[in-house]
Design a protein with these regions (language model features):
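Catalytic nucleophile-loop/oxyanion-hole region of alpha/beta-hydrolase
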Residues: 86-88, 102-138, 304
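Catalytic active-site module of serine/aspartate enzymes centered on a nucleophile-bearing elbow/loop
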Residues: 290-322
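Active-site nucleophile elbow and catalytic-triad environment of alpha/beta-hydrolase enzymes
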Residues: 227-250
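Short amphipathic alpha-helix adjacent to the substrate-entry channel of hydrolases
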Residues: 80-98
Length: 322
């Protein structure tokens, strides 16, 4: 287990401050170049937002590495973690892209299928599109996208298209994460923030009168997953979905270098991976603090918040994989 210290000042150690504050700190706006592609089902358009580096094409492919970010639930290229990572990737001289899951990034779905935490076929499809254009691909996934990427790395093994992966704040055991989210603060603060937008999108989609009634009564993510996510994506119940979509059982099968970063105080997570749960190609980096995709520090010399802990760990890991 890697021990790379993350030690914020005492007044930043609260997990809820770590989780909520980044949304208000990141002010940079980035000029992404957007391309639309069809999803793996050839039903819906999905948006890929690129930041390109100066590069040359050799045999039709860019030679500098591409860093791919798989966003979290209801995330996008405008999420604070995407913009923070993008700046570091630009500084390193690499290409950057955020492929959005179906219905995210402002592009509505055309079919009945949205996205879920275990849809590795969709990730493989996205990476396949990118492999046609880029010689070297590194991938990072956060939260829901982190679980999907970790599962992908184990499920696809040597066929995984990216050279290596970094997984951050991932609910690799979805059932226990669902329980964690239903605790008092999670239910009062985080659940409405995540649940309300996705319910609104679902209500705008092709749904029955019974589904509409049930969705309007949903009070937690478990309700939504039982009513909508599970049946829409071929699972018989939320428990079936959580069991099949969780990355934890697949971590032993990972054969390409993978770094999993988790804060012990993450309010979104339940059971997390331990050394005996993963293959020899997986590095576990566990910090005492950091919240959920937070990891905010403070530089007293410059009197500024620092949000580069995760991007720096990720880029160092990618460069070490070469």
């Amino acid at each position: 287990m890697m021990n790379t210290t993350f030690a914020p000042p005492f007044w930043l150690k609260n997990p809820h401050i770590q989780t909520i504050l980044p949304k208000f700190l990141v002010k940079d706006t980035l000029d992404y170049e957007r391309h639309l592609y069809k999803d793996s089902l050839d039903e819906s358009d999905v948006a890929f937002d690129y930041l390109l580096a100066d590069d040359v094409l050799v045999d039709g492919k860019y030679q500098k590495p591409l860093v791919v970010l798989f966003h979290g639930m209801e995330g996008s290229s405008q999420s604070h973690y995407a913009r923070t990572l993008a700046k570091q990737v630009q500084t390193a001289g690499f290409h950057f892209v955020v492929p959005h899951f179906r219905s995210c990034g402002g592009v509505a779905v055309s079919g009945k299928i949205f996205y879920n935490a275990g849809d590795t076929a969709e990730l493989h499809h996205y990476l396949g599109i990118l492999k046609q254009q880029y010689q070297t691909i590194y991938a990072m996934g956060v939260s829901l996208g982190g679980n999907a990427l970790a599962k992908y790395m184990g499920e696809y093994g040597t066929d995984a298209i990216c050279e290596c992966a970094v997984v951050v704040s991932a609910p690799v055991d979805l059932a226990s994460a669902s329980i964690a989210m239903d605790r008092l603060l999670g239910k009062k603060i985080y659940t409405p923030y995540l649940l309300n937008p996705i319910i609104k999108k679902a209500l705008d989609n092709q749904i029955t009168a019974d589904e509409i009634t049930a969705l309007k009564r949903a009070k937690c993510m478990g309700d939504f997953d039982n009513i909508f996510t599970a049946p829409r994506h071929g699972f018989v119940s939320k428990n079936d979905y959580y069991r099949q979509a969780s990355a934890l059982p697949y971590l032993k099968e990972i054969v390409k270098p993978t770094l999993i970063i988790t804060a012990k105080d993450d309010p979104f997570l339940g059971v997390t991976a331990e050394r005996g749960d993963v293959s020899s190609q997986v590095v576990l980096l566990t910090t005492e603090h950091g919240g959920h995709i937070g990891f905010i520090d403070y530089d007293y010399a410059t009197r500024a918040f620092c949000m580069d802990y995760i991007p720096k760990r990720a880029l160092a890991f990618f460069e070490g994989c070469v």
